[in-house]
């Protein structure tokens, strides 16, 4: 089994999703199937077929999340130190052209969320940053062209772990 690098927070979110799927979504769909089945003839029962399709989707998602959890390799970012960019680092950059500042945290593919400033370790920006240090200038090659950044800072901080979902 190929190991999937992940932060502690990413693993917590996956476990929370699995708990929600098993304890909320699965029982809810079982109830919907039972109610639809009570309406009679299953061959022409659109509610029943829709509920069974939804159940299949939920069971598939449960299997997928269980696989991700089983193959997770949790990287403790607090064990890193120094100014070299590695998985889990929070990196502040300055756009060499515009002077704009941006901060990214390098995470596993399953955790990436640009809106939260989390970029995949396999993204063009992360690939350009890995192994570099504070003060280095990096050129990021992406489908949109080349962009130059200067690494302002590299930090290794534990992200705030998510709380249990509602």
Swiss-Prot record:
UniProtKB keywords: DNA-binding, Transcription, Transcription regulation
Highest rank taxon of the organism: Bacteria
Organism expressing this protein natively: Anaeromyxobacter sp. (strain K)
Gene3D superfamilies attached to this UniProt entry: Transcription elongation factor, GreA/GreB, C-terminal domain (3.10.50.30), Transcription elongation factor, GreA/GreB, N-terminal domain (1.10.287.180)
Molecular function GO labels: DNA binding; RNA polymerase binding
Annotated coiled-coil segments of the chain: none
Pfam families referenced in this protein's UniProt entry, alphabetically: GreA_GreB, GreA_GreB_N
Keyword Cell cycle: no
InterPro entries listed in its UniProt record: GreA/GreB_C_sf, TF_GreA/GreB_CS, Tscrpt_elong_fac_GreA, Tscrpt_elong_fac_GreA/B, Tscrpt_elong_fac_GreA/B_C, Tscrpt_elong_fac_GreA/B_fam, Tscrpt_elong_fac_GreA/B_N, Tscrpt_elong_fac_GreA/B_N_sf
The protein, known as: Transcription elongation factor GreA
Function description: Necessary for efficient RNA polymerase transcription elongation past template-encoded arresting sites. The arresting sites in DNA have the property of trapping a certain fraction of elongating RNA polymerases that pass through, resulting in locked ternary complexes. Cleavage of the nascent transcript by cleavage factors such as GreA or GreB allows the resumption of elongation from the new 3'terminus. GreA releases sequences of 2 to 3 nucleotides.
GO-annotated biological processes: DNA-templated transcription elongation; regulation of DNA-templated transcription elongation
Family, similarity comment: Belongs to the GreA/GreB family.
Signal sequence bounds: none
């Amino acid at each position: 089994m190929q190991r999937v690098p992940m932060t502690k927070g990413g693993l917590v979110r996956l476990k929370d999703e699995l708990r929600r799927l098993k304890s909320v979504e699965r029982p809810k769909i079982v109830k919907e199937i039972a109610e639809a089945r009570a309406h009679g003839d299953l061959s022409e029962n659109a509610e029943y077929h829709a509920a069974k399709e939804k159940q299949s989707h939920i069971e598939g998602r449960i299997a997928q999340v269980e696989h991700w959890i089983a193959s997770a390799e949790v990287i403790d970012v607090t064990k890193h130190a120094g100014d070299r960019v590695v998985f889990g680092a929070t990196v502040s950059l300055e756009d060499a052209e515009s002077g704009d500042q941006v901060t990214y945290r390098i995470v596993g593919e399953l955790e990436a969320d640009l809106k939260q400033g989390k970029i995949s370790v396999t993204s063009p920006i992360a690939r350009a940053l890995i192994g570099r240090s504070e003060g280095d200038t990096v050129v990021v090659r992406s489908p949109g062209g080349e962009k130059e950044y200067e690494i302002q800072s590299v930090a290794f901080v534990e992200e705030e772990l998510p709380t249990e979902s509602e």
